[in-house]
């Protein structure tokens, strides 16, 4: 329509990066002291968030290690699952999710005291699925220690993620 202008009530207000980060900090704080399997992410702290990327950090501690004294592969796989799902959850808030595929390649060892920077990228969000990848880097030298990929299906008639009540956490 010529001469038509949208009213300010029609405009969608996008959250700021600070608001997105604050939301993810609240979500990860809910994992602290969790009694379910998400407790493996209780030492993870979000540091940067966009609609397509979530960057977190974690200091590797003794409870994260395998018998050889390096970061346990199961810990890395679970963090790939949790952090990539949270990256999708930044924009997909009205749907439950389930893993369809999860794969991790382990490249270098990580030891106690190492700080990991974990970056999850949302590659594509479709009508029924989302595709992500994840990189684990040692902050001390920037070298990649692991690379993961995670495909998620959106569940019909399931609750979405709620920061307030910790649904799916």
Swiss-Prot record:
Entry-linked Gene3D superfamilies: Hotdog Thioesterase (3.10.129.10)
Keyword tRNA-binding: no
Record InterPro entries: ACOT13, HotDog_dom_sf, PAAI_dom, Thioestr_dom
EC class: hydrolase
E.C. number: 3.1.2.-
NCBIfam families the record matches: unchar_dom_1 (TIGR00369)
Family membership: Belongs to the thioesterase paaI family.
Name recorded for this polypeptide: Putative esterase F42H10.6
């Amino acid at each position: 329509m010529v001469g038509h202008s949208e009213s300010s009530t029609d405009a969608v207000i996008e959250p700021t990066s600070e608001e997105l980060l604050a939301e993810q900090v609240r979500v990860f704080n809910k994992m602290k002291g969790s009694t379910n399997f998400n407790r493996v992410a209780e030492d993870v702290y979000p540091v940067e968030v966009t609609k397509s990327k979530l960057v977190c950090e974690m200091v590797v501690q003794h409870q994260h290690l395998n018998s050889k004294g390096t970061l346990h592969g199961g810990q890395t796989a679970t963090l790939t699952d949790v952090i990539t799902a949270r990256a999708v959850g930044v924009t997909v808030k009205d749907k439950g999710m389930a893993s369809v595929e999860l794969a991790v390649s382990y490249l270098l060892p990580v030891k106690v005291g190492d700080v990991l920077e974990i970056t999850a990228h949302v590659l594509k969000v479709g009508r029924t699925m989302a595709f992500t990848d994840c990189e684990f880097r040692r902050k001390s030298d920037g070298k990649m220690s692991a690379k993961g990929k995670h495909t998620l299906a959106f569940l019909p008639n399931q609750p979405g993620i709620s920061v307030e009540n910790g649904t799916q956490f």
